[in-house]
Amino acid sequence: MSATDRYSHQLLYATVRQRLLDDIAQGVYQAGQQIPTENELCTQYNVSRITIRKAISDLVADGVLIRWQGKGTFVQSQKVENALLTVSGFTDFGVSQGKATKEKVIEQERISAAPFCEKLNIPGNSEVFHLCRVMYLDKEPLFIDSSWIPLSRYPDFDEIYVEGSSTYQLFQERFDTRVVSDKKTIDIFAATRPQAKWLKCELGEPLFRISKIAFDQNDKPVHVSELFCRANRITLTIDNKRH
């Protein structure tokens, strides 16, 4: 390939890359949406497959696009920074970010407190309310939240709660309980089939699993929970200061 040909190819590649970026910015291809195939883009932009492939590979490397084997190439959802590290509830977090929040309850039931009695400091023969929800930010599933709430401490919470309610507001308004701190443990977990369905991800895709114990103003456990979030949907930043 001559120097002139290489220069021409670079110009074409840069033009295609920019046009794809412009289409994404203008909403032609939205977050989570599949872009056209390489053949379709070749026809659309009247360029070679090599040029299209290089432009797409570059945008994948930049985190703008994501390839799903056997499915195609999709627009990457924008990452949310520290959404799961905040002590405030999810509703408050959405307000602080100027984004709309929504939830979908996928499981709710009374179960034995035995597996959680030590963490919640409650009798093993009591019950907890298990609430499992998919939490959405601007209509995109952000994480799955499974919470276990002690009914011995918060009687009839399962009857008071309705889908869409802020659990932290209910704690404060009905039980004079404010969640002021929590203890979190973070690890990586492979997405199960149900999790992949709700989070719109691949089976086995890496998820952040955040296990949490929330505490009230009197340092008593309020609830325990597990949150599962796609690792490519969130950035966790941890600041440490030496005193």
From Swiss-Prot:
GO biological process, one term: negative regulation of DNA-templated transcription
InterPro entries tied to this protein: Bact_HTH_transcr_reg, Chorismate_lyase_/UTRA_dom_sf, Tscrpt_reg_HTH_GntR, UTRA, WH-like_DNA-bd_sf, WH_DNA-bd_sf
DNA-binding region location: 38-57
Keywords assigned by UniProt, alphabetized: DNA-binding, Repressor, Transcription, Transcription regulation
Domain HTH gntR-type: residue ranges: 10-78
Keyword hit for Membrane: no
Statement: the UniProt record of this protein carries the keyword Cytoplasm: no
Pathway the protein acts in: Carbohydrate metabolism; fructoselysine degradation [regulation]
Any Pfam family hit: UTRA
Cystine pairs: none
Any one Gene Ontology molecular-function term assigned to this protein's record: DNA-binding transcription factor activity
PANTHER family to which the protein is assigned, alphabetical: MANNOSYL-D-GLYCERATE TRANSPORT/METABOLISM SYSTEM REPRESSOR MNGR-RELATED (PTHR44846), MANNOSYL-D-GLYCERATE TRANSPORT_METABOLISM SYSTEM REPRESSOR MNGR-RELATED (PTHR44846:SF1)
Function according to Swiss-Prot or TrEMBL: May regulate the transcription of the frlABCDR operon, involved in the utilization of fructoselysine and psicoselysine.
Protein name: Probable fructoselysine utilization operon transcriptional repressor
Origin species: Escherichia coli O157:H7
Species classification: Bacteria, Pseudomonadati, Pseudomonadota, Gammaproteobacteria, Enterobacterales
Gene: frlR
